Amino acid sequence: MSQIDKASRRQKIKDRSRAAVAGTAVKPRLCIYRSLSQIYAQLIDDSGSTTILAVSSMSKENKELKGAGVEVCRTVGRQLGEKAMAKGITTVVFDRNGFRYHGRVKALADGAREAGLIF
């Protein structure tokens, strides 16, 4: 499968899932982006088009962590969950952004659940 086919396939999946997933101020959307070397997660209020909270493997508190392996992703998920709970957010809508729910994406979701987020 060529790179163009992979990109267009992911875009189709992303568009299809975004049609069904929307976040509000009470129940924001947990959006994940996974690159080859890093992982990013943010809570988004789609009704106000604002980012409520963002955490990544490149954040200041994650300087000692190397790369974006499964354990790093689990740590990022825990940090996101803890910060969300501190802001009073307990439930979210999970948006995997066209990525498979496997490996690093699953680890981030599990870390967020460990911190107390419900989705």
From Swiss-Prot:
Biological process terms in GO annotation: translation
InterPro entries: Ribosomal_uL18_bac-type, Ribosomal_uL18_bac/euk
SUPFAM superfamilies per UniProt: Translational machinery components (SSF53137)
MF annotations from Gene Ontology: 5S rRNA binding; structural constituent of ribosome
Disulfide bonding pattern of the chain: none
Domain of life: Bacteria
Gene3D superfamilies xref list: 3.30.420.100
GO cellular component: cytosolic large ribosomal subunit
Keywords, in A-Z order: Ribonucleoprotein, Ribosomal protein, RNA-binding, rRNA-binding
Subunit structure: Part of the 50S ribosomal subunit; part of the 5S rRNA/L5/L18/L25 subcomplex. Contacts the 5S and 23S rRNAs.
Family, as annotated: Belongs to the universal ribosomal protein uL18 family.
Biological role stated in the UniProt entry: This is one of the proteins that bind and probably mediate the attachment of the 5S RNA into the large ribosomal subunit, where it forms part of the central protuberance.
UniProt-listed PANTHER family: 39S RIBOSOMAL PROTEIN L18, MITOCHONDRIAL (PTHR12899), LARGE RIBOSOMAL SUBUNIT PROTEIN UL18M (PTHR12899:SF3)
Protein name: Large ribosomal subunit protein uL18
Upper taxonomic lineage: Bacteria, Pseudomonadati, Chlorobiota, Chlorobiia, Chlorobiales
